[in-house]
Amino acid sequence: MRERILMNRDWRFLADPGADPVPKTQSAMYLSSKTERLKWGPGGWRHNDTPGFWNLYGELHNEPWEKIDLPHDYLIDQTPDVRENSALGFFRYYPAWYRKHFTLNENDRSRRLVLFFEGVTGIAEVYLNGCFLIRNNGGYNSFEVDITDIARFDDENVLAVYVNPNSYETWWYAGGGIYRNVWLEKSDPVAIERWGAFIPVRQTGVAE
């Protein structure tokens, strides 16, 4: 049986992050080069998304993370500016990060775990516990990623999504962000695929 858990509550959001700052310590560079789980930046598992706190490497940062719920469009609150592109609603389009912390129980170890995104504007890069999983191009399609081999059951999981709406898919206001639901789906290792099973018809005619 497939269990679906809505993941829309309690996300962290960072708008227009710019380039990741270069770490000041040798230890940060060393650890980041050794394992995906200690990668530097907002996609990393141990990145501190609480403003004003010391990070894993003993450096103070003050990123303006916000607490938000999904669905979320982070561009719509702007005041339209005539200096921006009229075809895109006179809004400035810029990238952003989303992060969500969640836990799994021991009973989930034997199950297949999939994250299903109903819609993310533009280009989306998905990380779990610092590991890059998938890049999706297109804000008008759903997509999924299997996290069974990356998920942690003895510690907190951190899902990070980098959104870049500058893909110019439209000539109208397209918005920016995770603008539809996100689901965590748990199933048996062997289960019917999402869109069901079917038997192709190889010939037509009267059934016998």
Language-model regions, residue ranges each:
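Hydrophobic alpha-helical membrane-insertion signals
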Residues: 1-60
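Accessory beta-strand-rich segments of carbohydrate-active enzymes
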Residues: 3-5, 12-19, 45-47, 73-77, ...
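Serine/threonine-rich low-complexity intrinsically disordered regions
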Residues: 25, 32-33, 50, 64, ...
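Predominantly extracellular/luminal regions of secreted and cell-surface proteins
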Residues: 52-75
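Short glycine/threonine/proline-enriched tight-turn/helix- or strand-capping micro-motif at secondary-structure
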Residues: 81-85
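Contiguous beta-strand segments within globular domains
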Residues: 203-208
